[in-house]
């Protein structure tokens, strides 16, 4: 029997077609593939306990009725296991534990003997379920990769957004530093100017004082010279007057006194 492969536009269409085909064959496929994967591992003996009964029913549908009838010893397990369970467990938990243990014993008995060959429909169902599960896993992994890529892109965008703000803050800090430096330089310049002004004022005052002193000295010298000249003139006049009197006196003395 040849199977023609169909092409589908999307994964959802392929899944719906697969479900229709399996229902037409009398099978009920499960669409929750992650749970199916756990059930498959449990049937292969990777897990020691089974938490619910639907997996047992699904496995029961996959195996032919002859395989279940050929292992009657597995039916006597619940009574022996139930006697071994502790008395403090609740009724519901003990029932679940009993079902899980009986199912594990059943699967061990089934797979310890000669393996039962599956027919074509069962093999196709298992392969198809694993193929669909693989596609679902790829679909979810691609979604996860796109979400991580979007998150990383968002982080990069936020970092880029943060960088201009940091640049603005840095520029504002640099401006404030520059203003402070400029104000300090201006203060220093004002101080230097005031010091220079005071120095120049002092120098000007000293120069003025020195010039006045020189002027006073010159004036004093000129006065001294004038006074000396006048004194000389006076003394000269006095001398001249003294000499004239003496001659008169001499004549007077000669005439009267007879000297």
Curated annotation (Swiss-Prot):
Cysteines engaged in disulfide bonds, as pairs: none
Keyword DNA-binding applies: no
Domain of life according to the entry: Eukaryota
Residue ranges, compositional bias (Basic and acidic residues): 163-176, 183-214, 221-233
UniProt KW Coiled coil keyword: yes
Any coiled-coil regions, as ranges: 169-249
Bias type Basic residues, positions: 151-162
Chain spans, region Disordered: 141-259
Keywords of the record: Coiled coil
PANTHER family membership: LYSINE-RICH COILED-COIL PROTEIN 1
Name of this chain's protein: Lysine-rich coiled-coil protein 1
Native species: Homo sapiens (Human)
Lineage: Eukaryota, Metazoa, Chordata, Craniata, Vertebrata
Gene coding for it: KRCC1
């Amino acid at each position: 029997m040849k199977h023609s492969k169909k092409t589908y536009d999307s994964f959802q269409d392929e899944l719906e077609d697969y479900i229709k085909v399996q229902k037409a064959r009398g099978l009920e496929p499960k669409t929750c593939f992650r749970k199916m994967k756990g059930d498959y591992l449990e049937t292969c003996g990777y897990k020691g306990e089974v938490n619910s009964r639907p997996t047992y029913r699904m496995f029961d549908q996959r195996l032919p009725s002859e395989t279940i009838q050929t292992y009657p010893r597995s039916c006597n397990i619940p009574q022996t296991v139930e006697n071994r369970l502790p008395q403090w467990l609740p009724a519901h938990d003990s029932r679940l534990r009993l079902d899980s243990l009986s199912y594990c014993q059943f699967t061990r008995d089934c797979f310890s003997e000669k393996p039962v060959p599956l027919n074509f429909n069962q093999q196709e169902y298992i392969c198809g379920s694993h193929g669909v599960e693989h596609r679902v896993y790829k679909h979810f992994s691609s979604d996860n990769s796109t979400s991580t890529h979007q998150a990383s892109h968002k982080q990069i965008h936020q970092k880029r957004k943060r960088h201009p703000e940091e640049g603005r803050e840095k520029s504002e800090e640099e401006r404030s530093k520059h203003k402070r430096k400029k104000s300090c330089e201006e203060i220093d310049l004002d101080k230097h100017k005031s010091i220079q002004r005071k120095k120049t004022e002092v120098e000007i005052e000293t120069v003025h004082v020195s010039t006045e002193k020189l002027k006073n000295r010159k004036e004093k010298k000129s006065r001294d010279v004038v006074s000396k000249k006048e004194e000389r003139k006076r003394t000269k006049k006095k001398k001249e007057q003294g000499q004239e009197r003496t001659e008169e006196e001499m004549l007077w003395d000669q005439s009267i006194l007879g000297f």
